[in-house]
Amino acid sequence: MKLLLLCLGLILVHAHEEENDVVKGNFDISKISGDWYSILLASDIKEKIEENGSMRVFVKDIEVLSNSSLIFTMHTKVNGKCTKISLICNKTEKDGEYDVVHDGYNLFRIIETAYEDYIIFHLNNVNQEQEFQLMELYGRKPDVSPKVKEKFVRYCQGMEIPKENILDLTQVDRCLQARQSEAAQVSSAE
């Protein structure tokens, strides 16, 4: 019985520690540098994120610059071929908020992160007369826990993005081969 209570106590402590790792403000941007994988993608205009959509991109890594700007290295498919793109995103005055021009003007912010596990972004895009919003879930590994995915779905629902507009990118070609061949080229050059 004591062993059972001890195990239960340890489980509760561990669960509490995991929740404390989640950051929703006062972000330490240096901790988001490094490799990431696109996990879930959602938009209120689904065509933007479907195959051949202008916002269907697959993150490779994020680099933080000395002025707190971010460089996102991503892949997108052009005529069925994975193509590398880099986007420089400028820090705004608000915590965790950035802007970038890509298929219009984009203003995005970090919703929450557990630096070593996942990060969730919300983006608003304005392109001429059309506006849309987009949500992204990135993971440090090729997939994240169902609990994190459920949290992302709840955020999307809060932003009035329907569940059917959430794409699970772990089920599609995310250009992982292009990412691996780039890493192999870098290591052979060193």
UniProtKB/Swiss-Prot annotation:
Renumbered residue ranges of the record's region IgE-binding: 43-54, 76-83, 91-97, 125-132, 139-152
Keyword Repressor set for record: no
Subcellular location: Secreted
GO molecular function, one term: odorant binding
Glycosylation sites: 52, 67, 90
UniProt entry keywords in alphabetical sequence: Allergen, Disulfide bond, Glycoprotein, Secreted, Signal
Disulphide bond pairs: 82-175
Any one cellular-component term (Gene Ontology): extracellular space
Signal peptide: 1-15
InterPro entries, sorted: Calycin, Lipocalin, Lipocalin_CS, Lipocln_cytosolic_FA-bd_dom, Maj_urinary
Subunit structure of this chain's protein: Monomer.
PANTHER family xrefs: LIPOCALIN, MAJOR URINARY PROTEIN 1-RELATED
Family under the similarity heading: Belongs to the calycin superfamily. Lipocalin family.
Identification of the protein by name: Lipocalin Can f 6.0101
